[in-house]
């Protein structure tokens, strides 16, 4: 009889006698499997994946094939694991730490030799796109998302002219509206739904509690990569692919919602100090914005990012862009921000060019006839958002989108310096992850990559599905176009609003001026002398004032003090609390700690020195009469010193005439 066996490495055919046992089947099977297969992990089943009844081959080795009910031509599904690697290609903790030895044998007694072959495209851990069972029980959201989940989000309305009921009644004309009501959003000129309003809209269509059906997570992230562990049993991509594991065609459309609705800068000085680099050097600048997320009342169930500080990582400023260097202390800066109750909320960079009019005006580069966000900036923002995913218990993967925002400082149509805020769509982030698109020289279009590499060879890891987008043609019809080779970038991002509070209450008061990091080429460097000057260490020692010594409410100064590694963790936490909450009791407690006293001693010995007074100033202070005529006193002192110098020269000349030229003078000795 002929049996067909389908496994992870393809289809096998084995001829057996019905009287043979499964031990004989295992011997024939091991001769055709890769040498790295672990015989103890071979399983057989009557259905693919977890649908069938899996049995270990070693447990049924004594049974005959006909006793199980197998007939000629039957299909058996086989699964196994490799030595030193799991079945999905990720490293095994036990096998990876111990090398293979000759004691590992096959079922027929032959030794299994080690191999150097590695999978072409190993899976990351955990596998991307993997779903989570009951994510609403295991996923931990931010406190802000939990608060918004508890709100109903209804938009209240007053009594309308069409109402015919009393003050305590309600009808269709005055009942509250849903947060995703299209008519209300159009009246308020709100272009995009908030994330939680979009969630309510999707959930109302996905789950019907009145029907008694089980709950289904309403959110799902797009996935445009080839799925691994395909249940069809063929070799993994790129050796094999089928309709179940390959991604579907992509139809791009503008994203109807945004994860963050508004960007608020706590103080105008935050942006002004960031732009000073361009004002002084003419080069562009890049920074990471640190702040926190809070509710935004102007949009139903809205979220805003409140920026409290901008950290400038190592970079090389140029007239037309920025080259980023390695940011070695990123974890340290994030730790300081975490102690202050902050987190990275976005990235900001400048794109400014002086108009040459001499009135401070700049050139308007970004407008409706050119572009707002270039293709290169879209890819860069997508990578940043991919590094900051947002956990969500409403998604089947436990995460959905990102709250990371992008701000660009450029010139507007009036020639003024203006800020523009954006976010890249979730589809754009996934297309960058899947390596489907790449930026072009034209900032208004994005290119769809080819499966061939630059040298003409076919990529063994990249799979490019069909990409389409819809547009209004010259006849006013809504048509679908092929995105290859390029498509407009407007399909890949959404716009955000921005602004400043009416009454600025920044977290960092910035009372002590301290240089911003990585500005050495401008003549600004973070040194001990700058820290001593910002903290007014010497003035404190001379005047005894405790208030002057506590000017630590500066994010850049906190990062510098963290790099000095003088304070302990508890003392540094207390320092950040003093800098953000401005509590006088905490300030006195900090002054009494050992670490702070050690820091003050270091800054006093290596920091800023008090300039010494000149001798003339000491004389004027000791002689009040001389201070009444400072000009004449200075003239008399200079004349007196000059007369003494000439007198010394004359005495030396006379001594040389009497005693000879070889004898040194008293002045020379």
Curated annotation (Swiss-Prot):
Residues of the MPN domain: 263-400
UniProt cross-references to CDD domains, sorted A to Z: MPN_NPL4
Primary localisation category: cytoplasm
MF GO annotations: ubiquitin binding; ubiquitin protein ligase binding
Superkingdom classification of source: Eukaryota
Membrane topology qualifier: Peripheral membrane protein
InterPro entries: MPN (IPR037518), Npl4 (IPR016563), NPL4_C (IPR007717), NPL4_Zn-bd_put (IPR007716), Ubiquitin-like_domsf (IPR029071)
GO biological process, one term: protein transport
UniProt xrefs under SUPFAM superfamilies: Ubiquitin-like
Stored Gene3D superfamilies: Cytidine Deaminase, domain 2, Phosphatidylinositol 3-kinase Catalytic Subunit, Chain A, domain 1
Subcellular location field: Cytoplasm, Perinuclear region; Endoplasmic reticulum membrane; Nucleus membrane
UniProtKB keywords: Cytoplasm, Endoplasmic reticulum, Membrane, mRNA transport, Nucleus, Protein transport, Translocation, Transport
Record field: compositional bias (Polar residues): 90-108
Region (Disordered): 87-112, 613-637
PROSITE patterns: MPN
Span of the signal peptide: none
Cellular component GO terms held in the UniProt record: cytosol; endoplasmic reticulum; endoplasmic reticulum membrane; nuclear membrane; nuclear outer membrane-endoplasmic reticulum membrane network; nucleus; perinuclear region of cytoplasm
Function: Involved in the import of nuclear-targeted proteins into the nucleus and the export of poly(A) RNA out of the nucleus. Has a role in the endoplasmic reticulum-associated degradation (ERAD) pathway.
Family membership noted in the UniProt record: Belongs to the NPL4 family.
Protein name per Swiss-Prot or TrEMBL: Nuclear protein localization protein 4
Species in which this protein is naturally found: Pyricularia oryzae (strain 70-15 / ATCC MYA-4617 / FGSC 8958) (Rice blast fungus)
Gene name tied to this protein: NPL4
